[in-house]
Amino acid sequence: MNLIAQLEAEQIAALGKTIPDFKAGDTVRVGYKVTEGTRSRVQNYEGVVIGRKGGNTISASFTVRKISFGEGVERVFPLYSTNIDSIEVVRRGRVRRAKLYYLRSRRGKSARIAEVTNYKEKSE
């Protein structure tokens, strides 16, 4: 393991976050800390993960897409952000691609993703 990867692994361990195993096609609920003036609250953002970037490094991120009031909304979250309160996998999707950018041009039934019923957690 090279020096940079070793430093990143130490930083990830220092954060102490537990990131669930999720991939493109999964529906996730991200609890994001929002600060409004002096108050801080957790806002949930639920949608389909259309891509992950950066593997499991400290700079990794993932893109979540949802339909809000008939408009497609995408948001990119840094995986190890201090503003992320929680990541919860709502359902597992069965897809054959790592990046689901084709969902941007689809609406309704053609944008559906089949659910995985026989998912097994990865043991580490």
UniProtKB/Swiss-Prot annotation:
* UniProt keyword terms in alphabetical order: Ribonucleoprotein, Ribosomal protein
Which ranges of the sequence are coiled-coil? none
Query: Which Gene Ontology CC terms are recorded?
Result: cytosolic large ribosomal subunit
Q: Which PROSITE patterns does this UniProt record tie to the protein? A: RIBOSOMAL_L19
Q: Which GO terms describe its biological process?
A: translation
**What's the encoding gene here?**
rplS
Please indicate if the UniProt record lists Nucleotide-binding as a keyword: no
- Recall the GO molecular function terms of this protein's record: structural constituent of ribosome
Give the family from UniProt: Belongs to the bacterial ribosomal protein bL19 family.
Record's keyword annotation contains Cell inner membrane? no
The protein's name: Large ribosomal subunit protein bL19
Q: Which Pfam families match?
A: Ribosomal_L19 (PF01245)
Q: Which domain of life is it from?
A: Bacteria
InterPro entries registered for this protein in UniProt: Ribosomal_bL19, Ribosomal_bL19_CS, Ribosomal_bL19_sf, Translation_prot_SH3-like_sf
What the protein does?
Answer: This protein is located at the 30S-50S ribosomal subunit interface and may play a role in the structure and function of the aminoacyl-tRNA binding site.
